[in-house]
Amino acid sequence: MKKRMVVLMASAAMMMLSGMTVSASENLDNVVDTSYGKVQGINSTDEGYENVVQFKGVPYAAPPVGDLRWKAPMDHEKWDDILVCDTNREMPMQELGFVEPSGTDFHNNTAPEMSEDCLYLNISTTEENLTGDEKKPVYVWFHGGGLTVGHTYSAEGNLDAFAENDVIAVSVEQRLGVFGYLSLPQLSEEQGQSGNYGLMDQIKALEWIKENIANFGGDPENITVGGQSGGTTKATTMIASPKMDVDVDKLILESGLKYVGAFQSQEDAEKNGTAYLEDLGLSADISMEELRAMDGEELLKSASEHYPGRMNQDGLYVAYPSIQEAVNEGVFDDVSILSGANMGEGQYLQTPTADEF
């Protein structure tokens, strides 16, 4: 198996960031101001999308590494030069056994590398919309894979097709699995609650989009959110969150409305997290200092029945016991919803036929 890059130190992340900048005296095509600094996109090389400008790997929060592991996302440090956003960033940390069988076609002929430094988003717009006065609708898309696997640059997330049709399209990476949804008594003691870090990332991303998308040609007052499979869970739970301050009144939910099933209670989530530590051979009362110092790959054990991958009703980010209850309480009454089912949904869970091998 190809060795995967795992970036764990914030200092290393900042070194990588500085290495991606260019001076202000060089090419200034497709340069956009953001709240953190200037970013530069590239023209798409895909046939039929030559007018599309892509911004790949735009930071929306500080790398959640080191002392920021299992904490709410923080603002990114500002930069002075131009950040060239021409390359897909590493996907969030996850068990690759669920990702690799889908093949390189699904991953747009890439071999996904992974990193805890994953709080980036991608934007597709057009040259005309970058410079025009009329602001266009915005679509924010969340990938599938439950809350444990996946990434934004798989074949299912074709942002350029939206951009070509005058929609400013955005896809968002967020923490997954043990890095996004671990709940522990010692974490709750530290923060008042624990888990739901991936959901916190989503909300942080929407706040960044609201603040900055106009500079990419998007209308911050006309944002639609959607997702595929597990992305529908992300989208609906985010809209129902009391912490979600960005107004969104349109949802596109591919592969169903996630209205069934209750969230874990905070207590049950903490018990599950403690059991997961024991599955890893760790003491249940290990300190957060020790946990945050561990290598990220040592924390991955998705075969465990206790692997963290569910949101919990913490009373702060998740207030309702289920999305169904949020629907019953009228949370979605003013939200227009387009829903359908995707061909091949859940196919990786099925046993392939001989012809499919």
How would you label these PLM feature ranges?
Residues 232-244:
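Short glycine-enriched nucleophile-adjacent loop
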Residues 4-23:
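Sec-dependent N-terminal signal peptides of Gram-positive bacterial secreted proteins and lipoproteins
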Residues 211, 245, 254-357:
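Substrate-access "cap/lid" subdomains that shape
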